[in-house]
Amino acid sequence: MAHEGSRQVRDRGVTRSKAEKVRPPTVPVPQVDIVPGRLSEAEWMALTALEEGEDVVGDILADLLARVMDSAFKVYLTQQCIPFTISQAREAMLQITEWRFLARDEGESAVAEDPTWGEDEEPSACTTDSWAQGSVPVLHASTSEGLENFQGEDPGGVDRIPLGRSWMGRGSQEQMESWEPSPQLRVTSAPPPTSELFQEAGPGGPVEEADGQSRGLSSAGSLSASFQLSVEEAPADDADPSLDPYLVASPQASTGRGHPLGFHLSLEDLYCCMPQLDAAGDRLELRSEGVPCIASGVLVSYPSVGGATRPSASCQQQRAGHSDVRLSAHHHRMRRKAAVKRLDPARLPCHWVRPLAEVLVPDSQTRPLEAYRGRQRGEKTKARAEPQALGPGTRVSPAAFFPLRPGIPFRDLDSGPALLFPTLNLGLSSPSLESKLPLPNSRIRFLTTHPVLPDVARSRSPKLWPSVRWPSGWEGKAELLGELWAGRTRVPPQGLELADREGQDPGRWPRTTPPVLEATSQVMWKPVLLPEALKLAPGVSMWNRSTQVLLSSGVPEQEDKEGSTFPPVEQHPIQTGAPKPR
């Protein structure tokens, strides 16, 4: 056992010696300085740990201080609630008191001397967009300027200018027609030129016939005038400068451009050139002061032959007056440039019809119908026995349907047979696409459009409204409306007095066809109250269609006099029930 113990000790010593021999030598770790010679790495780590602790403590103190200040502010608000309320009430009372006593505002003092005050500048006009829709430049030039420019464009080739004709037509139509140029200066007024003058026409050009125009103009209708002026001159070297530049033009230049030259005259030019009726209305005189008085139908020609100006054979008797014509034309042009006469609205041609209406106070008890229409009932029945259709030129005066006050013009429509009826206004609007109206049922019945009226409408003894008193002055209108409904209206010819109408044939008087209402809208009508439950005011009557009884108030009314000629009136109220089969 001792031997084994010594062996172990010996082995341990050998192992320890081997280990000491194999262990390498330790190398010292070099020291790193954060700040060379001042702050090492170990000192830096110690300072960093200390600063982190201070940051944690600072956050805790800031949180504690915020809680304390919040609690203190709440206590302050609680203490200042009453003083704040008192101050707000004081300011409100002071403001209300100031409203009761308004102070005058003196405004700004010395505004003219204050350099900060000044007049606003005019805003600049907006720029017109040439690409905008409807942006088209339009030049409006007066007539006189257009004539001067027109002459200045072509001063060499001066020949003629066709003037226009205005105020021609019938009725209320006013039209302007261009006249074709003529190589003569012609002043035409009724009567037409004689045959001798037409036969003496020289080589200046063909003479146009004017019988058609004179035959179509009416002496008692509207004012119709025919005035043509055209002057032919020699070439530019032989042209007389005293001629009126308003009457010259260049047809050669117009032919080269491919369209005729012309212009629209103003109202002043037409009014100056038109023949006007004098006070007596029996003759025509020329208003133009520049043109001398020429006999009706005389043709004055200025042809250009051989470069010289000479009159034609039709005006050889007035050879000595050519210079006067030129001087008067020049004088007229100078006067036109000096001052243009203004139009007199009272003398302008007006086309209207003044119906002759007689204002009467009709006697409602004796003859209300004759006071309104001016004819006996027997003559009306005789004239009604022979109906006749209206001709294309027949005109019916509106005074036959409703009275007009004197002095009120009534314009006549000149488009075919002018038959006028009073407008029947039912107070119903036409249904639109969005209207929700129910379809018509059997309760609604409209009048048929057949030309033959029902027998009830043509009955000679229709039922009268018993004990009905119309207001004073309305009896004739009520009867006329009833006859229009029944189709027995006779309208006398317009413009004829009572004596003239008696001499005419009653069969020639026009007959009017009563207008028949057509179904243009769907109207549902249902009575809200029964007629028997209504309480009528004194003097008011209502016709009950179902019972054929006239409902009236309790006040008794006087009976009609025996001499009263009250007209029959047909009553067609709205159907409230289904129509009964006949």
Swiss-Prot record:
Bias type Basic and acidic residues, positions: 1-23
Region: Disordered, residue numbers: 1-29, 110-133, 147-221, 310-331, 551-582
Pfam families (UniProt xref): DUF4639 (PF15479)
UniProt entry keywords in alphabetical sequence: Phosphoprotein
Modified residues (Phosphoserine): S242
Biased composition (Polar residues): 311-320
Keyword Transferase (UniProt): no
The protein's name in its UniProt record: Uncharacterized protein C2orf81
